[in-house]
Amino acid sequence: IPALDLLAHAYGALDNWEKTGFYGHQALVLKDKAIPDLEHEIIPTPAPKNGKRIISFSLFGNNSKYIEPAVLNTQLAPVLFPGWICRFYVDDSVSAEAIQRFRNNGAEVIKIGAPLDNWPGTMWRFLAINDPEVEYVIFRDADSIICYRDAAAVSEWIKSGTLFHTIRDSGSHTALILAGMWGAKTGAVPDMQERIQNFVDEGYPSRHFADQDFLEKELWAYIRQNLFAHDRLFDFCNAHEIPGEFYSNYQIAFSRC
């Protein structure tokens, strides 16, 4: 991790938000400058009016660290995100019992098979962006609990009319786009499956960070052109304050379960 990111992370752990913001802002500006403009224009496809609103998760394995927060999210979604549906992209490693628990709470479950099961699993959730029945999609981590500030930020984004949304709420949120803290109007990125497959075929340095590497290298130059950003700390990309009261022991995307 580059030095500026490390400093932002470290001061964030100390709740020194002023220094966190100072170093994180510099880190983000440098990363942004390193991304060239698009070589070829991307033309979004229209999203259906009054289509589904999806909270999209990837899930693999049967570790309770991921299963139980995922179940909790299906319970919280109707309260915090009324009208939204949790959707889980899963492979055969997720038990039938867990899948039934999700469905009992109104969630959708999509089974991933070959060849997509060879992708880094965290990238499956991005497929929702091309679902013709969906109007808006937000991408979240299965082990992070959704919260009212997240919901309020998403509501502001939708009212803005922009294609994309990002959130930053912690000293560790210094990636250009966090894979579990962004959203889009569906159709905003055409041919997502093909784009991911090309990225996977070309090889990637880290399976753990493949989702964020993909977003940064392949899509950030496009996303930043039509973005509504919420950012508590870094004053990056004309960011807006996250609505609602902040509690230092729980940031959006917090995952200490």
Question: Where in the sequence are the language-model features?
Answer:
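Active-site-proximal specificity loops/subdomain of glycosyltransferases
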Residues: 92-135
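Catalytic core and acceptor-binding pocket of nucleotide-sugar-dependent glycosyltransferases
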Residues: 185-257
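Short aromatic/hydrophobic "clamp" motif used to bind/position activated sugar donors
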Residues: 137-139
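Conserved donor-nucleotide/metal-binding helix-loop-beta segment in metal-dependent transferases, i.e.
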Residues: 146-177
